[in-house]
């Protein structure tokens, strides 16, 4: 365990003058992860499993007098969420608390502690997308979130742009066409609605141009911008500051069992004193897992 912070570590604060002390706590943006991941309550178990089912193909014609055809559904794959505990703590000596009371040092570091837990959640959520093209991070179906070969009954489907490209009018339109041609686990056409762009900070202005320009971006023609005129991506762009690729981008759809944060135990804050030293210990923990079930929730490209 790390040693408690002592008054000697904060000499400029506890000496008998009122210092102007910058507490190091910055304002933070609203939660970014919640724009992309839906929080759900986890079940009271060590892990949570979601079976992904497949149904039936198209119904065949039945000539007069012929018996009806039977088909079987089943489980295509299982997605398992394993709950993990995340936490951090700090300790303060009683002397430091007493002599540093003009900046309420316990409250200051409690805010730092809260920001550390928020940062963990943001990093874990962003890393689901940072590893979306990496075969070392498979989903329940055995391939990454973004893949050209998601297995389904009698074939595969792709949620990756056929030709890797940076964010542009053309690449965005091609991805939206791909979403329009989405199929279910039996290969039947389905209705997926593209909800929003997901981009790194370097693409925020390009995303704004593509989503809000009345005319087609990047050329001198007087063509309308079909993304805007049709009313696609009506939730705009979600910008995640912790995305590591400056060129990758994604389109999130309304697939119902998509990007999830399953909360097993919400944030718990505890404080206790040490009888022998009079130090105070502060701890915060929470337990959850973040990931995805249906990869149709995201279509993407790593860019070039």
Describe these PLM feature segments:
Residues 2-8, 40-49, 67-70, 92, ...:
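Short low-complexity stretches enriched in small and charged residues
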Residues 22-34, 45, 118, 125, ...:
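Residue-level signal for secondary-structure boundary elements
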Residues 1-29:
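N-terminal alpha-helical "arm" segments
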Residues 79-84, 94-95, 135, 143, ...:
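Flexible, active-site-adjacent loop/turn segments at secondary-structure boundaries
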Residues 103-108, 115-178:
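Alpha-helical scaffold segments that mediate packing/assembly in large oligomeric complexes
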Residues 24-86:
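Assembly/oligomerization interface modules of large self-assembling protein complexes
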Residues 2-12, 146-185, 191-196, 202-304:
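Sequence/fold signature of self-assembling virion shell proteins
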Residues 78-135, 197, 282-284:
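Long, contiguous amphipathic alpha-helices that act as assembly "spine/axial" helices in icosahedral shell
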């Amino acid at each position: 365990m790390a040693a408690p912070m002592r008054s000697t570590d904060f000499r400029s604060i506890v000496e008998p003058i009122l210092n102007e002390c910058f507490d190091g706590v910055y304002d933070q943006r609203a939660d970014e992860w919640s724009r992309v991941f839906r929080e759900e309550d986890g079940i009271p178990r060590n892990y949570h499993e979601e079976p992904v089912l497949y149904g039936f193909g198209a119904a065949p014609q039945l000539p007069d007098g012929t018996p009806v055809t039977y088909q079987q559904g089943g489980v295509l794959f299982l997605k398992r969420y394993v709950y993990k505990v995340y936490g951090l703590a700090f300790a303060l000596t009683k002397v430091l608390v007493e002599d540093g009371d003009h900046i309420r040092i316990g409250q200051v570091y409690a805010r730092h502690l809260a920001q550390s837990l928020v940062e963990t959640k943001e990093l874990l959520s962003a890393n689901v997308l940072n590893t979306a093209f990496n075969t070392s991070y498979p989903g329940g179906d055995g391939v990454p979130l973004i893949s050209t070969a998601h297995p389904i009954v009698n074939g595969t489907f792709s949620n990756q742009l056929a030709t890797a490209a940076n964010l542009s009018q053309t690449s965005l339109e091609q991805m939206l066409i791909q979403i329009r041609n989405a199929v279910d686990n039996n290969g039947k056409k389905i209705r997926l609605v593209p909800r929003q762009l997901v981009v790194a900070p370097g693409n925020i202005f390009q995303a704004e141009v593509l989503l809000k320009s009345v005319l087609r971006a990047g050329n001198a023609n007087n063509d309308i911008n079909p993304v805007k005129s049709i009313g696609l991506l009506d939730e705009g762009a979600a910008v995640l500051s912790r995305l590591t690729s400056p060129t990758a981008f994604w389109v999130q759809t309304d697939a119902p069992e998509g990007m999830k944060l399953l909360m097993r135990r919400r944030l718990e804050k505890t404080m206790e004193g040490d009888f022998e030293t009079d130090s105070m210990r502060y701890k915060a923990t929470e337990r959850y897992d973040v990931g995805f079930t249906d990869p149709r929730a995201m279509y993407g490209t790593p860019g070039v």
